[in-house]
Every structure is written in C-alpha cells, then in structure tokens.
C-alpha cells in the first residue's frame, strides 16, 4: 500500500479539477473544448509523470452523478431506508413514490439511471400488484433493483425483465441493512463512469477505481476535528457549479436511522452557480424572501442577468440562503434539520474561491433572523484550500 507521500489525489468536478500531492494542491478551471484527460495532462502533466497508475487516486462528479427513482411501501421504513442509502452512496434522488398512491404520480420524462423497489419485511409478501408493472412500463430507465421482502422477490423476478434482486434493506426487527444496496449503487456509479467517453479515458493514468466525489468527501466527516475547529453537531455545505451537497450530523434530525455512520448526506442537484445557474435563479425567484435578501445585499434582480464576479458572489450567497431554507421547517424537503442546534457550519467547494467568512456569516445571520426569528450564530468554518476533500481522499485511499 502506498503512503500519502507517494500518492496523487485528483478530483474531477463539473467546473474545476483539483490535483493534490504531498507538496502542493493545484486547482484549474476545466477547458470544455478538450477531453478531461487532455486538459488534465496539459495543465498538470509534469505532476502526473511523477506517479505510477497504482499511486493515483481519482474521484469525480463530472458525470453528473446517477439519478434514481424509489418506489416503496411506507415512508416510515422502506422509503426512508432506501433514500438514506442512496444519498450516502452519492446518488441523486429525483422522486420517492408510495406504492399505494402510484397512480397519482406523474411519469418523469428524463432517463432514470436506476429504479429502486423496496418494501415489507421478509415474512410479508403480495405488496406489489400489476400497477407496478404498468408504471414501470411507462418509465425510461436503465437499471431496476429490488431490495424488498423475499416473497415478492420471486414474483417480481418472473414479471420484470432484467430485475436485480438484493437482500432486503429492512430486517425482521425493522433495522436498516445498508451493505448490499450501497455496494450495488457504488458499482453502478463506477460502470457509469466507465461508460462516459470523456471520463473513462482517466483509466489510462490510474489503476484504481474512480469513486463519487461526495462519497470521498464523506470519509472526512468522522475525522474532521483533526484538521478543523468544528464542534458537533455540525453541517458541511459543499456548494459548487452544478450541485450543493449537504453532510450533516445525525443528531440534527428527530427521526434518526441507526447506521454505522454518524453523518448523513442530502444533495440538491440543481443548486449551483455555473451549470445549474438558471435553476438556482428560478428557485430564488420563487422564494418570497429572496427579494428582501437582494435588497439586504444592495442589489436588484437585474443581477440575475449579469455575468460578473459580483453576480457570481451574489448567486453563491443566494445558494447558501436557499439551501438553508430547504432544510428548515419553512421549506422542508427530504429532511428538516434542527438548525437551532447547530454549533458549526463548514463550507467547502467552489464557494471557498468566491466568498470570504464575512460574506457567509452575513447570509447565515440573515437566514436565522428572517426565517427562524433567532439570533443563533453557528461558528462559520471556511475550507479555503479544499483540505476536507484532501482529508477524505487520503482516508479513502488508505482503506483501499
């Protein structure tokens, strides 16, 4: 096994790529007129030559991540467990469907990378009738996996083509079983990367598996205190060009799931300032407090039409506000966090190159005053040198 001194860590993002070695950390804007490998070689060729393929570890979010639709029996167990596993595997969830109401749900128009079917403990069967077959027949999807009760596994296997059957994510004591679905989704991400023409060429320089960036960042959370002055419970906001990832202490949710990890993840897929710029603006325009925030920042809605450093800064500040709204009782999404219990908020990703601590604290204070009617002030920690990613990448690589 290589030591950290002999290892090169690379992260390929939607907008930037980063290269970290013992001696330095490089960050470069991607040139979208070139293949990723060609761009990487052009800008970091001398560094790459110093390492063997066995000593180069790569993670990536440049393929946009995998999308999943989850069909389950109840929100209490099956849907909740499958959603938790998917998010913590670096998968983007587009919707969760309660099977008994499946006829009330619209059909997504986009291609879905994987559909997950889940529900029931192994002593119960007969939970999925022909309505499931009818709904799936209208979907455009690439993979279908079943992680529900054992009796229905046999029935559905005979009815649904190319169904992958894995052990139930709900055991007989209603506890979560993570391993099998998590491994499946991680491997599916790997296959997706290998199928992406622009990313699979990266295997010319590495002999190691390429993992999802959010998964790698998640490896840093248990050891975050070794590099940062962070007090539990905390949240980590990774705000970039295409998405915003949030990693949070489980103490911040009421309905906690007992798993091996002390932190969970949620992703807001279309909340970024470059590739997801228009989606971010649309979300802001539909938030009744965004206009007031713009006034607080002494700008108007005309800033949405500008392409300047100032506009990028304002959009980053809006992203902070909007994602906090989405995790609050004001605009609840998948989870509602106990934001008044947070002691630290850690920021990483592209945001660290645009905003300083004062810029961030201004928005956090505005959110707490306006939305939560509170003077609560969590400590802001800004990862200005991507040390969190480096920490997670080293931890992940040491386990390989």
Residue ranges and their predicted role:
Residues 241, 290-306, 385-400:
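Long, contiguous domain-sized segments
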Residues 14-39, 80, 88-95, 257-279:
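Short glycine-rich, Thr/Ser-proximal phosphate-binding strand/loop in the N-terminal lobe
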Residues 110-113, 272-306, 310:
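A structural-propensity feature for long, helix-poor, extended segments
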Residues 222-227, 252, 326-329:
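Conserved helix-loop functional segments at active or binding sites
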Residues 242, 248, 321-322, 326-344:
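Hard-cation-handling environments
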Residues 232-291, 356-375:
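Glycine-rich phosphate-binding loop of actin/hexokinase-like ATP-binding domains
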Residues 206-213, 301-332:
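Adenine-nucleotide phosphate-binding core of ATP-dependent small-molecule kinases
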Residues 1-9, 24, 31-34, 39-233, ...:
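Nucleotide/phosphate-binding catalytic cleft detector across ATP-hydrolyzing
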């Amino acid at each position: 096994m290589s030591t950290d001194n002999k290892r090169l860590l690379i992260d390929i993002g939607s907008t930037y790529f980063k290269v970290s070695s013992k001696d330095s950390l490089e960050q470069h804007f991607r040139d979208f007129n070139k293949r990723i490998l060609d761009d990487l070689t052009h800008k970091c060729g001398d560094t790459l030559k110093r390492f063997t393929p066995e000593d180069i570890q790569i993670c990536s979010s440049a393929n946009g991540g995998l999308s999943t639709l989850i069909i389950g029996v109840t929100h209490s167990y099956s849907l909740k467990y499958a959603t938790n596993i998917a998010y913590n595997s670096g998968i983007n969830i587009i919707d969760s469907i309660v099977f008994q109401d499946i006829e009330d749900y619209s059909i997504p128009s986009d291609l879905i990378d994987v559909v997950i079917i889940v529900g029931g403990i192994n002593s119960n069967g007969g939970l999925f009738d022909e309505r499931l077959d009818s709904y799936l027949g209208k979907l455009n999807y690439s993979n279908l996996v079943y992680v529900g009760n054992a009796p229905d596994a046999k029935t559905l296997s005979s009815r649904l083509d190319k169904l992958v059957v894995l052990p139930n994510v709900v055991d007989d004591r209603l506890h979560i079983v993570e391993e099998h679905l998590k491994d499946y989704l991680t491997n599916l991400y790997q296959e997706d990367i290998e199928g992406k023409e622009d990313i699979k060429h990266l295997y010319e320089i590495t002999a190691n598996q390429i993992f999802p960036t959010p998964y790698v960042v998640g490896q840093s959370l248990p050891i975050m205190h070794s590099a940062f002055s962070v007090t539990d419970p905390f949240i980590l906001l990774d705000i970039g060009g295409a998405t915003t990832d949030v990693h949070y202490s489980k103490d911040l949710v009421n309905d906690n799931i007992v798993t091996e990890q002390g932190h969970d993840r949620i992703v807001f897929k279309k909340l970024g300032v470059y590739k997801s710029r228009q989606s971010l603006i649309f979300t802001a325009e539909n938030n009744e407090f965004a206009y007031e925030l713009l006034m607080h920042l002494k700008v108007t809605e005309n800033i949405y039409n500008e392409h300047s450093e100032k506009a990028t800064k304002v959009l980053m500040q809006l992203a902070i506000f909007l994602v906090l709204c989405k995790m609050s009782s004001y605009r609840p999404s998948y989870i509602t966090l106990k934001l008044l219990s947070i002691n630290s908020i850690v920021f990483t990703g592209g945001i660290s190159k645009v905003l300083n601590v004062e810029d961030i604290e201004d928005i956090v204070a505005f959110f707490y005053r306006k939305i939560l009617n509170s003077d609560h002030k969590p400590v802001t920690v800004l990862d200005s040198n991507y040390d969190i990613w480096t920490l997670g990448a080293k931890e992940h690589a040491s386990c390989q």
